[in-house]
Amino acid sequence: MKKGYIAFAALCAAALASCTCPSAGEQRLRPSEYVSTLVGTQSDFSLSTGNTYPAIALPWGMNFWTLQTGKMGDGWAYTYGAHQVRGFKQTHQPSPWINDYGQFSLMPVRGEDKFDEESRASWFSHQSEVAKPYYYKTYLADHDIRVEITPTDRAAMMRFTFPDSKESGVVIDAFDRGSQVGMVDDRTIVGYTTRNSGGVPENFRNWFVVRFDTPFSAIELTDAPGGYKPGSNLLYPEGQKSVTGEHAVAKV
């Protein structure tokens, strides 16, 4: 019996010796690295494989962000088989059948007159897409712009990297139904979106502030016929390489 205990102890010691602990320079793989936010996104009205969208968000975050491939108001905001980006949307959507509320979007573009969701749309490829809960990156081929997004508890940080040539801009679309967008100064946009799918008070508003690290050279405040889609097109001078925006949001 004593020999058995000794043999068992020796076996345990050998097993422990074979285990390697991460060195000081090594990083442990975070659980979030195992998450693919693209699972379930190959869905549409006729067939669901999950009816999800690639949420860029922290656990229990106030707001989620997602790439928008569908048209404004489409419950399937992101479909894996789509090849065009229309914007990067703040969303609170629980499912495509219930749809969204309090949403607005930002879209970096090149050139002027890009407010309409069709004219500002850009081709993108999943080959250039990185989709993690804490970080999203893609490349807008038609505009030659790289987009990066990372979330906070209540907001998000975005970085748009533009080409060296041609005038660049950022479209802020607060969607329809009485939403408003205005300018505080040459770095700050404030507004609110009233867009919803029902079930909210009559005076519902989702207020937002967008603060940029670089002043814009001009602003075009847009209000389509009938007050359909208020928003703004911020223009940056030629040679502006990178713009970072920070957003803050409050619901009333």
Give the location of each predicted region.
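Short amphipathic alpha-helical "recognition" segments used for binding
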Residues: 6-7, 93
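Accessory carbohydrate-recognition regions in carbohydrate-active enzymes
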Residues: 25-252
